[in-house]
Amino acid sequence: MDKAMLRNIPKVDELLAPTHALCPDASAAAVTAAVRRTLDALRESVLSGEAPEIPETAALCALAADAARRAETPSLRPVINATGVVLHTNLGRARLSGRAAKAAADAAEHYSTLEYDVESGGRGSRNAHVEALLCRLTGAESALVVNNNAAAVLLLLTALTAGGEVVVSRGELVEIGGSFRVPEIMSACGATLREVGTTNKTRAADYAAAIGEHTRALMKVHTSNYRIVGFTESASREELAALAHSRGLPFFEDLGSGSLFDLEAFGIHGEPTLQGSVRAGADAVTCSGDKLLGGPQAGILVGKKSCLDVLKRHPLLRALRVDKMTLAALEATLRAYADGSAVSTLPTLAMLAASPEELRAQARTLCEKLTERGISAEVLAEGDAVGGGSVPAQTLPGFAAAVTPRHCRVDELAERLRQRETPVVARIAHERLLLCLRTLRPEEYDELVRAVAESDR
């Protein structure tokens, strides 16, 4: 340890003004904290013998200013999604429509009718804001919203199957991420999982053979994040609903992603709709709000009134209920389906509906802008993905602007783009950076081009 070096470390007060001059938008508190952390780190380096010398004051101020800027940069902030993955789980899944975002902001900023009945002047139900819409759109007798689909399944099984058995196909024992698995959730709900059939083949007769005195329900789980192909067979929801009802049991279906729109129109196959499950006879259907539905994070339950009334009275519901902003955004999203504007106004559906011709034209436009800045870019046909644990094994025909960096490696370019104030997240393939058009908005092009130009150095 060099005591002379310790004495040469500047005092906090000496660095405050010059540091603040480098980051004038930072608060005084952030600058002071950053200067202290910078000097503390330097002191530790001297004590450990790692610092060969004391840096110049200007260098210390630059380090502190950078730390102050980082400290005041919001952790949760907008991202430019150039991955072509529409429901990117790590980037927040579904983007809200302008109408839904405004509804959420209004609910946050103002007092609201969250649990207030304007007719009677008494207490109302927060579920009432979306229940009628959900019933109208799905044909269900009743509806309920909780904070995500995992919560919806948890509430459903806890309230209606605790202490009994639930019959599920072995081929549908899914994990949806974060170690949230059907067998574990059954155990947590106090129910016993009764597996039937095999991984690739399960028939209605397998369910029938498993029904006994302890059976509380038959359940079908849509394998939204994987597919079993080849020599396969599964019981239809219609078969299972009829079987369950013939034995005096309820039939549940967990759709996972869930949809209110027939995605076959976009060339996306195998995704059932909520209304289809209701028509098939399901007593309760669950799905997510922030995936194919295109709304906020929520768990949606629709089905028979007799089932959902039990859920509405269960004490667990209070722990799983949604807030006013979620309800406002969900109501606005559902109204888009009700008035027929969903495909044109909900970003998720609009992105899924984008044709290859539209995307190719957009890719040409972006490449022209990139070329004008001296960036090497060309239009490249590339497959996009739905994402969000939805529609596995299907790619959407898309186009990208493929950038070949001139002054750095492609991985360095990608890293620099990620670290910008507004991060740009893209893909790397064929030794080029791919900017996929399906998930980009035209109003983002100029900022994206500037980001690439400034990062390719």
What are these regions (language model features)?
Residues 1-68:
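Long amphipathic alpha-helical segments
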Residues 9-10, 80-84, 293-296, 396, ...:
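Short Gly/Ser/Thr- and Asp/Glu-enriched loop/turn motifs at secondary-structure junctions
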Residues 35, 40, 82-83, 93-119:
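Glycine-rich phosphate-binding segment of PLP-dependent enzymes
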Residues 51-96, 100-103:
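Long amphipathic N-terminal alpha/beta scaffold segment
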Residues 75-76, 143, 287, 422-427:
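A short linear hydrophobic-aromatic micro-motif
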Residues 120-337, 370-371, 451:
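Conserved PLP-enzyme active-site core in the AAT-like
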Residues 306, 314-315, 322-370, 382-383, ...:
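Structural motif of enzymes handling amino- and sulfur-group chemistry
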Residues 356, 360-441:
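Conserved C-terminal alpha-helix-loop-beta "cap" of PLP-dependent enzymes
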